[in-house]
Regions:
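Terminal peptide-recognition signature
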Residues: 32-34, 56, 62, 66, ...
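Conserved active-site neighborhood of the chymotrypsin/trypsin-like protease fold
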Residues: 8, 39-41, 53, 58-139, ...
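Gly/Ser-rich catalytic serine loop of serine hydrolases
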Residues: 50-55, 113-119, 161-179, 250-256
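Active-site loop architecture of trypsin-fold serine endopeptidases
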Residues: 46, 74-76, 111, 131-143, ...
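A short, Trp-centered hydrophobic/proline-enriched beta-strand micro-motif
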Residues: 25-47
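C-terminal cap/linker of serine protease catalytic domains
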Residues: 1-24, 111, 137, 179, ...
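PDZ/PDZ-like groove recognition
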Residues: 8-12, 40, 167-170, 217-282, ...
Length: 323
């Protein structure tokens, strides 16, 4: 298996061992590269691609934590280790609510695990390292810029995501390492914000405190044993205090209900919504997957009601092969 593309973080923002009270090199050796192959008929093939690459973190013997979209519907996974070896992995599972994914290494890794810390204890302004596979030259010294709610266009909400600055250029699955050398989050996205008349980029990190409640189920069953949220199968964004549909999942509930790109979501069961987070939470409050979701929409000057028969998103995905 060929190595992942060669690149380096600019030297000015690479972490220096003398700046940290823990063994930086040891901590970064726990971060692995990840490369996955997705079948062409996968539900996420068009949106996320047939080949995906990023990072993962060794959190237990042979167990790698990553961001779930890298391994969703993966039929083949390769792990690139700090010593140059490449080991095949098995996608154990992906949790839709948190965004975490788990991979089991099918060969010996022989590197230390990164101890899990507390994301709740992490403070805005705290010095952190965003660790990428390949050591210091592919890792970034930064700080926590914010801890706040995040809503994603794919029907996803975190009550308190972590945002770091500057942004890591290969953020997916990176390890957010605290000032004490503990794992406090997993890299998910790069976002842009305007500040002092200029645009700057941040990383959005999934906080590690969301992992313990889901870890055992993911490891054993490939998904979490909880009531499944209703899924509408639409992509939406906020534009001037309005929730606007920007995409429809093929053959999903919204497509069956003939919701269209450009529709404005006015209300859920009569309750007005103006933010993504409020929209999703009102939908989820109406029951579990399969629940009928009453929406009020606005389209081309006309306001109308529609009922969407929600579904379980996982039923549209190729699941991990249990072993």
């Amino acid at each position: 298996m060929a190595s992942l593309i060669e690149w380096k973080v600019p030297q000015a923002v690479q972490p220096r061992p003398e700046d940290y009270p823990y063994d930086l090199e040891r901590a970064l050796s726990s971060v692995v590269g990840l490369h996955s192959i997705i079948p062409s008929d996968a539900f996420t093939a068009d949106t996320l691609g047939l080949e995906r690459a990023g990072n993962g973190v060794l959190i237990d013997d042979g167990l790698v934590l990553t961001i779930g979209y890298l391994i969703t519907e993966a039929e083949t996974v390769w792990l690139h280790l700090a010593d140059g070896r490449v080991v095949q992995g098995h996608a154990l599972g992906f949790d839709q609510e948190t965004g975490f994914g788990l991979v089991e290494a099918l060969g010996k890794i022989d590197f230390p695990v990164l101890d899990v810390g507390s994301s709740k204890a992490a403070e805005v302004g705290e010095r952190v390292v965003v660790g990428g596979a390949g050591g210091r030259t592919r890792s970034l010294a930064g700080r926590i810029a914010a801890k706040q709610e995040f809503a994603g266009y794919w029907e996803y909400v975190l009550d308190e995501a972590i945002f770091t600055f500057p942004a890591h250029p290969n953020w997916g699955g990176t390890a957010l390492i605290s000032a004490a050398g503990k794992l406090i989050g997993i890299g998910s996205l790069q976002l842009e914000r305007a500040r002092e008349g200029k645009n700057e980029y941040l990383n959005m990190i999934v906080p590690i405190d969301l992992l313990p409640p889901v870890l055992n189920d993911l490891r054993k069953f490939g998904r979490v044993n909880r009531q499944v949220r209703p899924w509408l199968g639409l992509y939406s964004t906020e534009i001037e205090d309005k929730v606007v549909v920007v995409g429809i999942a093929p053959k999903g509930p919204a497509a069956r209900a003939e919701i269209k790109t450009g529709d404005v979501v006015v209300a859920v069961k009569g309750d007005l919504v103006s933010t993504l987070a409020a929209f999703y939470r009102k939908v989820w409050a109406l029951g579990h997957a399969g629940a009928e979701i009453p929406l009020t929409l606005y389209r081309e000057g006309v306001t109308f009601d529609v009922r969407v028969n929600s579904s379980d998103r996982a039923k549209f995905l190729k699941g991990p092969r249990l072993h």
